[in-house]
Design a protein with these regions (language model features):
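Active-site neighborhoods and metal-handling regions in enzymes and metal-associated proteins
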Residues: 1-240
Length: 240
């Protein structure tokens, strides 16, 4: 019964898609407002709190999961599993955001990285690799392709660039009334994708003490391929 219900929930109707777009619009707006505050001296928890407040101000019923903000770079050697702290952020740090809104029960899930100061050559390179991995996964996400094939498309780009050790998770998941719904875009998942599914594509590269970059958008699968319902650009944002 659970499998049948998951299959029904995976395909969204037009009303559900409209609510998902509204939820995506909230997180786009919030990042645009919060990104300029990513400067040396601010703490991760301050940024996370600002995200949560602004999501509610823009109509979200709350966060679709605990908001995560964490820095990575030469000044921070901790592992990426620590997703928010009271640490003050320093110049030379890339600050990754992972958060989602809720619109009438329907969730969004979103991520970007904002750099404090001029990014190093490696940061720029890793950012380009992560964006290329997301695009490869998007192109692989066509009706009839399996969830695993989408994951492997992103994995291939990152492995070939030499950063495979820094990509430690599945590339995405379906999303709707729950922020994490089946099928999951993981190596072992053979579920065929169908039009009407909405799912995240969220590759990342995290190398403690060096660099951390993530991107996450929600995509709608149509008859001709995957369409990003988020509007935020994919440039590496750098604040002075």
């Amino acid at each position: 019964a659970d499998d049948v219900l998951a299959g029904i929930r995976a395909i969204k109707d037009e009303q559900e898609i409209a609510l998902m777009r509204a939820s995506a619009s909230i997180v786009d707006t919030v990042l645009a407002e919060v990104a300029p505050r990513v400067v040396a001296g601010i703490t991760e928890i301050e940024l996370a709190s600002e995200v949560d407040l602004r999501m509610r101000q823009h109509g979200s019923l709350g966060a679709s999961f605990d908001t995560r903000v964490w820095g990575m770079g030469p000044a921070l050697t901790r592992d990426a599993s620590v997703r928010v702290s009271t640490d003050a952020l320093a110049e030379g740090t890339g600050v990754s955001f992972d958060f989602g809104a809720i619109t009438r029960g329907y969730c969004s899930d979103f991520g970007r990285t904002v750099h404090i100061g001029e990014p190093s050559a490696e940061y720029v390179t890793v950012h380009e690799v992560v964006m290329a991995a997301q695009e490869a996964a998007r192109q692989a996400a066509v009706p009839g392709a399996t969830s695993g094939q989408v994951h492997e498309a992103a994995r291939r780009v990152i492995d070939e660039a030499g950063y495979g050790d820094g990509f430690r998770h599945r590339v995405g998941h379906c999303i709707g009334l729950d922020v994490h719904e089946e099928p999951f875009l993981s190596a072992e998942d053979t579920t065929p994708l169908q039009p009407g599914m909405l799912f995240t594509i969220e590759p990342s590269i995290f190398l403690p003490g060096r660099v951390g970059v993530r991107v996450e958008d929600v995509f709608l699968l149509t008859e001709t391929g995957a369409v990003n319902i988020n509007a935020t650009d994919h440039e590496l944002k750098a604040n002075d």
